Regions:
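Residues immediately within or flanking Cys/His clusters that coordinate Zn2+
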Residues: 28-31, 45
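Short coil-to-beta-strand transition motifs
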Residues: 57-64, 104-109
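Short, acidic/hydrophobic/Gly-rich beta-strand patch recurrent on exposed beta strands
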Residues: 82-88, 94-96, 126-128
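Well-ordered alpha/beta subsegment
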Residues: 2-3, 96-129
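Short functional micro-motifs and their immediate structural scaffolds
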Residues: 42, 55-57, 75
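Short, conserved beta-turn/loop elements at beta-strand boundaries and strand-helix junctions
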Residues: 71-78, 116-118
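A broadly conserved sequence feature marking short terminus-proximal activation segments
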Residues: 1-29, 129
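Short, cysteine/histidine-rich loop/knuckle motifs that typically chelate Zn2+
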Residues: 33-36, 47-53
Length: 129
């Protein structure tokens, strides 16, 4: 059973992160950027972790990134990859790498976002080569 066959649980949402999942349903990857210091951050939150400002805003990300680190889980029923992906916007996301040969993964490879459906909720961003 591959990740595509395995049911992905729906993420827990709340009003603070709902715009992230609303955009995902439209095929857009969003990140928060601070209007005070200009730094992007992920996981989305109202207070900037860099300067403490509450002047954060949603910005559409390019969906392009680089594998910073990864691990292939080779457990039954099928292998899957977990990775930290450094986005072009400067934030790092913990995610899955999908739809590719897991043995071909390498740190530093370029990846792009894809959105995968969940059991009963919004799609979630994952990445592929």
């Amino acid at each position: 059973m591959s990740l595509e066959q395995r049911k992905i649980p729906a993420p827990q949402t709340n009003p603070e992160i709902q715009p992230f999942f609303d955009a995902a349903a439209q095929g857009k990857l969003m990140v928060k950027r601070c209007a005070a210091c200009g730094q992007a951050h992920h996981y989305p939150r109202a207070i900037c972790p860099h300067c403490g400002s509450d002047r954060t805003e949603w910005r559409e990300a390019s969906g392009q990134g680089t594998i910073y680190s990864y691990s292939v889980m080779r457990r039954v029923p099928s292998p899957y990859a977990i990775a930290y992906v450094a986005l072009a916007e400067g934030v790092t996301m913990l995610t899955n790498i999908v739809d590719c040969d897991l043995d071909a993964l390498r740190i530093g490879q370029q990846v792009k976002v894809v959105f995968k459906p969940t059991e009963d909720g919004p799609p979630v961003p994952m990445f592929t080569l």
